[in-house]
A protein has these predicted regions:
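Donor nucleotide-sugar binding/catalytic pocket of nucleotide-sugar-dependent glycosyltransferases
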Residues: 1-48
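Conserved donor-binding/catalytic core segment of Leloir-type glycosyltransferases
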Residues: 38-70, 81
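Nucleotide-activated donor-binding/catalytic signature segment of Leloir-type glycosyltransferases, i.e.
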Residues: 93-112
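Acidic donor-binding loop of glycosyltransferase active sites
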Residues: 122-136, 149
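Short hydrophobic beta-strand element within catalytic cores of glycosyltransferases
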Residues: 150-154
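Conserved acidic donor-binding segment of nucleotide-sugar-dependent glycosyltransferases
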Residues: 166-167, 171-178, 187-192
Length: 254
């Protein structure tokens, strides 16, 4: 079983299926290798926070507006860019407007091409990934990390446990805990050195491990081992095609 979500192995284990036969997988959008990741991060707008996706309840874009309110009340200098459209758009704009944040601190940029989204990721210092357990993977996380963003990611989304090592290449928070999300965003706004460190480590995570090239090579090695009847559980220590063990729903402890 190739698990394109960190929760897949655990879901199947509940039915007694694929014991020790689950391997980590994922979605692999285009990987961009920049001439200098240091130069890219240096050019980023450190006070710019980006969110991208459909405006749906299980993606929790409203949590971003709530964080914006708290940042504003705390006197933080910031700008949030929201890319996307969806059923919550009117509600979100109303929330931002009522808080006096619309256009000043929170901008809604509408839908745009994947290429344009990547340009915004390359410019933003921080990226918020707020989806809950209904997000099977979330390829925007790969893209934001590839773009050198310091990510703050919900622990509940399927990609987060595989891609984000909390405190090393990004931050993880408990889905729905707005105060925790706010605290981690504010810490990054106030500590640009941490932004740089997380962003560079995130970039290396994607370019050196979690990408299509590595996944394809490892898939061939894994397939050959399985066809030969070889124990493949220790073939790779981590990353694509490494053994995927059942993950507890409450795996993330702050």
């Amino acid at each position: 079983m190739l698990c394109a979500s960190a929760y897949t192995a655990g879901d199947y284990a509940k039915f007694g299926l694929f014991h020790n036969r689950c391997y980590k997988w994922g979605y692999f959008p285009e990987t961009i290798r920049y001439p200098s990741i240091d130069d890219l991060i240096d050019r980023k707008a450190k006070a710019t926070i980006l969110w991208c996706g459909r405006f749906l309840d299980w993606k929790h874009p409203d949590d971003v507006i709530e964080v914006a309110k708290r940042l504003h009340e705390a006197g933080c200098c910031f700008k949030i860019e929201m890319i996307g459209t969806g059923e919550m758009e009117r509600q979100l704009k109303q929330q931002a407007s009522e808080a006096g944040l619309l256009d000043e601190n929170v901008r809604f940029l509408g839908a745009m091409s994947p290429e344009a989204v990547r340009r915004h990721m390359e410019s933003a210092g921080i990226y918020l990934f707020t989806s809950d357990r209904q997000e099977g993977w979330g390829a925007v996380l790969n893209e934001a990390m590839n773009s050198g963003c310091a990510v703050v990611a919900s622990y509940a989304a399927g990609a987060t446990p595989y891609l984000v090592n909390d405190g090393v290449n990004g931050s993880v928070y408990h889905s729905g805990n707005i105060q925790e999300l706010y605290e981690k965003v504010r810490r990054l706004l106030e500590n640009t050195t941490m932004q740089y460190s997380f962003g560079k480590a995130a970039y290396l995570t994607i370019t050196e491990l979690w990408n299509a090239e590595v996944a394809a090579k490892r898939f061939l090695q894994l397939s050959q081992a399985l066809l030969n009847g070889t124990d493949a559980s220790g073939l790779f220590a981590n990353g694509p095609c490494s053994l995927a063990k059942p993950l507890r729903e409450d795996w993330y402890q702050r």
